[in-house]
Design a protein with these regions (language model features):
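Short, well-ordered coil/turn elements that cap or connect secondary structure elements
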Residues: 9, 32, 58-60, 106, ...
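Class I S-adenosylmethionine-dependent transferase superfamily signal
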Residues: 28, 102, 124-128
Length: 182
């Protein structure tokens, strides 16, 4: 969906919140060769992996990676983006018992989004507007049953239009997108 929103030669600025190993940001930069991006991540280990991946994909000159608890390392007045993407932790804390051991071996900070799985989406919904240009886009990966709740969080702010959910190839809700009207 995101790639269909922009022309291949678009000169846009992308922010990836909870970038982890940089997969989403680096993939977007691969397909948008004139774009530049910033990835912010609280985990030093994940950020180190993102730096390795950035070097591997020869995108260091277009990527800035920062250790940050969500938006804390950014200056809202001086940091404006055309697109904000995020695959935040979204598993409900109570669902840990349903996960395989392989998943549970992952750092819990990367998995759990609070009691209802929406803690990070609340922050994203309230804060993204500070860092988006007018008519900027957001795209958040979600859990299979979180589309309506995440859409409602965005609607409550009154800052977004064209709020919708994109399904994955299996027909499951996967990404919520919207346009910032600030």
């Amino acid at each position: 969906h995101v790639l269909g929103t922009y022309q291949k030669d678009s000169n846009i600025r992308i922010l990836d919140v909870c970038t982890g190993p940089g997969t989403i940001l680096l993939s977007l930069l691969h397909y948008l060769p004139n774009a530049c991006g910033m990835g912010i991540e609280i985990s030093p280990d994940a950020l180190s992996l993102a730096k390795v991946n950035s070097e591997r994909f020869n995108s260091n000159d277009r990527v800035q990676l920062l250790e940050s608890d969500m938006f804390s390392a950014l200056d809202g007045e001086n940091e404006q983006f055309d697109l904000i993407v995020s695959n935040p932790p979204y598993i409900r804390t109570g669902d840990a018992k349903l996960l395989s051991q392989d998943v549970l071996n992952e750092p819990h900070i990367a998995l759990f989004g609070g009691e209802d799985g929406l803690d990070f989406y609340r922050i994203l919904a309230k804060t993204c507007g500070t860092y988006l240009k007018s008519q900027g886009h957001i795209a958040f990966e979600i859990g299979f049953d979180q589309a309506e709740a995440v859409k409602a969080l965005l609607e409550e702010t009154g800052q977004y239009s064209n709020i919708r959910c994109i399904t994955d190839l299996g027909g499951n809700d996967r990404v919520v997108t919207a346009v910032y009207e600030g």
